[in-house]
Amino acid sequence: MAKETFYITTPIYYPSGNLHIGHAYTTTAGDVIARYKRMQGYDVRYLTGTDEHGQKIQEKAQKAGKSEIEYLDEMIAGIKDLWGKLEISNDDFIRTTEIRHKEVVQQIFERLLAQGDIYLGEYEGWYSVPDETYYTETQLVDPIMENGVIVGGKSPDSGHEVELVKEESYFFNLSKYTDRLLEFYDENPEFIQPPSRKNEMINNFIKPGLEDLAVSRTSFDWGIRVQSNPKHVVYVWIDALVNYISSLGYLSDDDSLFKKYWPADIHIMAKEIVRFHSIIWPILLMALDIPLPKKVFAHGWILMKDGKMSKSKGNVVDPNVLINRYGLDATRYYLMRELPFGSDGVFTPEGFVERTNYDLANDLGNLVNRTISMVNKYFDGELPAYQGPKHELDKDMEQMALDTVKTFHENMDDLQFSVALSTIWKFISRTNKYIDETSPWVLAKDEDQKEMLGNVMAHLVENIRIIAVLLRPFLTHAPKQIFSQLNINAPELFELESIEQYGALTEPIMVSGKPEPIFPRLDSEVEISYIKESMQPDKIEEEVEEELPSKAQIDIKDFDKVEIKAATIIDAEQVKKSDKLLKIQVDLDSEQRQIVSGIAKFYQPEDIIGKKVAVVTNLKPAKLMGRKSEGMILSAEKDGVLTLVSLPSAIPNGAIIK
């Protein structure tokens, strides 16, 4: 009987620079899902790859004095090397410069053109080269005005400058499919995850009216040519999104993989591109009469204390640095444990070192070390066979093991990786406590308690085996080391089925003579400093004091220029050497911003985290006490007391307040 299939994809990454830990986070999460599903018995196909066309690649190659493909080959080699270091278990790596992809894109474009879903027109709009995205005037951040007319601004996705572009372009008729898309959302409520993303797509993009999408360019030539009009190259989203089916052989002479694995079970990506995957991609598939994927999951951003981590800001963490110095398992564990999948998380060197020392070295490493040492000390290395529970502590422990396995599966099915790991670590903590409760060193002094002592050792080793099995999707080395040191060689004891019931070690086993540390402890001060040094940007901005614009009376026309959006405060801290300023990070959905606010005398930083506030987003950036401030949080003032203007939590981040 054929196995049930499971098809998972990451976004294809844009190789205009070295990938950072945010890319590693997405791809590791996909790998965790793939490994878990394989353990469940699924026939898994895991796809990742690179999006290699566009103006930015062309410019990067020219600047490097290379052809586009020479530049790309070097970049892709680095990406594949990183995926190798992370031991990503992808089954395919798609490059959009491959013939197998190009031919499919060209066929799809001509088909959509022939059936009237694509038409030729002229486009004028604000274009960001790094984002490869057009924006309307209302979407621009920090618009520049001259005589009441917008003459520039920044991308809402990245903050890069935009330029006004006017050129002949083919358009994809998105609006034609609006009703059908909304109907699909209603019939498939789990399609967009987390659920808040669905509300954002509907309220921020669909309800205001979908605009037809420019799908070709003539102002550069590094891309896939439109066969019927070769002066046009296919624009990014029809090119990039099609990789999910071109990699399976759709429209090729051999489409067996497409028939076997499509529709995809899940597309995972960072939240800034969820609208392309939940609006454009479904509509494109509808136009092609292809079944839609089962789920689109948008995870949050990895933030620094000073805002979003990105290549353009120069505040990135290189995953190679972490892997090379601390090992793969420590890196994978931190990413999946510290950062809740679906929400934003903050990377800190302190957090990385603490997780490695406390969770891995102390809790897990010491449990394995202590147990193997006791089996060697009290039984000359030969673990007695499991005989069943001997007292209430054993029964409680066995029940917790079964409950842990059940909860773990629930967490994994919900893609709550950090919660799944927390569940495992509660079991690790309980097992460590079991040692203290049973006091093997006391039992060993009484020959009449030899059987009871053996029973304790059997429970400890069985617990460790269960822990190692549960960790297999996350850690690629430690579970193997644990099995090796316990001298457990039967392959069936590595699998999920073996932990559905407690007590699989029914025969004596001889553990290793001397346990080897799985996770050595780190010198916290040294390693925190090392990570911080590796994160330093190439260029530090000089601290320059700038004042915010002075107050003035305005009329209604001027007020209309003010852009106010809903945002959630995600981090706050006191500005050093200032008794009135807080440095605050806010989530505006499409971006994170840093705002310096003079509310320190009225609020403690921890008191405002999680508050929904109103933010003026189109103020010119300023610096206060050397800290960049990118907006203003609205507050009310009475008798010298400031109170933040709070908004209902139901208002989505990024919603415009009028």
UniProtKB/Swiss-Prot annotation:
SS bond list: none
Domain tRNA-binding: 558-658
Swiss-Prot/TrEMBL GO biological process terms: methionyl-tRNA aminoacylation
Coiled-coil residue windows: none
Gene Ontology MF, one: ATP binding
Taxonomy, superkingdom: Bacteria
UniProt motif ('KMSKS' region) ranges: 308-312
Protein name: Methionine--tRNA ligase
UniProt organism field: Staphylococcus saprophyticus subsp. saprophyticus (strain ATCC 15305 / DSM 20229 / NCIMB 8711 / NCTC 7292 / S-41)
Gene that encodes it: metG
